[in-house]
A protein has these predicted regions:
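Beta-strand-rich interaction surfaces with strong enrichment in secreted/lumenal proteins
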Residues: 82-84, 145-150, 183-185
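Short, solvent-exposed beta-strand-to-loop segments that form ligand-recognition rims
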Residues: 173-195
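Extracytoplasmic low-complexity segments
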Residues: 2-4, 9-72, 227-256
Length: 256
């Protein structure tokens, strides 16, 4: 029995180290530290975030520490200069652990607006007691608008919104699928009017509370991948880093 447990441990360790870099992970904030007003993007793209307002690293996160957002605070991603090749187009996933202070308002997990004024994405904790997952294509046409699941205040919940233009959309809360939507269209192609974590571009829907382990992908993850990332993080502790200094892939790659 001891030998078999040791062998299993070695197998899991080898899998962790051997995991290959996932080029579709474009943003990963593990919320373990703030570096002089900068939130480092652990996806290795070099596209870091800038703190605006009062955002603090606190204990009590789901996977280590977490980030607490005061009302009106946000992380600016400099959407106008986000590279086209890194902007999700044919697929997208947004995953995060969230713990909001109140359901007295809607809470924007992430928001971006295209240069043609399209409000292209809304992953939200809603004041009505549910969640929202929406994407739009060029010209402001809605691809899908999922409103489902049960939101509560002062409790950790995992949000997992995924989309693939070929197969459609799904919303997972705490790893369980609670809604789906159609595919068929590419996502609006740029973030020219801005991109933020925790506050809409027009200073609406402030996220107030704690957030942990936010990741954004330029493909639609599977339900199995969502569950793996929910439990282990987008980049598990101890995962390999390539020679170029970029982050190694998520555990999700092991599930393909």
């Amino acid at each position: 029995m001891l030998v078999s447990r040791y062998a299993l441990a070695l197998t899991l360790l080898a899998a962790s180290i051997a995991v290959a870099q996932d080029k579709d992970l474009v943003l990963y904030f593990d919320y373990e530290s703030i570096d002089g007003g900068t939130i480092l993007n652990k996806a290795g793209t070099g596209l870091d975030g800038t703190v605006n307002g009062q955002i603090d690293i606190v204990d009590g996160g789901k996977l280590g520490k977490a980030e607490r957002f005061a009302a009106g605070s946000y992380i600016d991603l400099d959407g106008a200069n986000w590279p086209a090749g890194t902007t999700p187009r044919d697929g997208m996933s947004v995953l995060a652990w969230v713990n909001v202070d109140t359901l007295g308002n809607d809470h924007a997990i992430f928001n971006a607006r295209a240069s043609d004024s399209t409000w292209l994405i809304h992953p939200e904790v809603r004041s009505g007691g549910n969640f929202r997952w929406l994407l739009r294509t060029d010209g402001g046409t809605t691809i899908f608008d999922i409103r489902a699941g049960a939101s509560v205040a002062s409790e950790w919940l995992h949000f997992g919104g995924v989309y693939d233009s070929a197969s459609g959309a799904a919303l997972y809360i705490n790893g369980e699928q609670v809604g789906d939507g159609p595919g068929g269209s590419p996502i609006a192609g740029d973030w020219g009017m801005g991109a933020r974590v925790g506050f809409n571009i027009d200073n609406a829907r402030p996220f107030t509370g704690m957030m942990d382990d936010l990741s954004i992908w330029k493909r639609g993850l599977t339900g199995a991948e969502v569950n793996t990332i929910m439990d282990a993080g987008a980049i598990p502790e101890g995962a390999a880093v390539d020679a170029g200094g970029k982050a190694a892939t998520a555990w999700a790659a092991l599930k393909r």
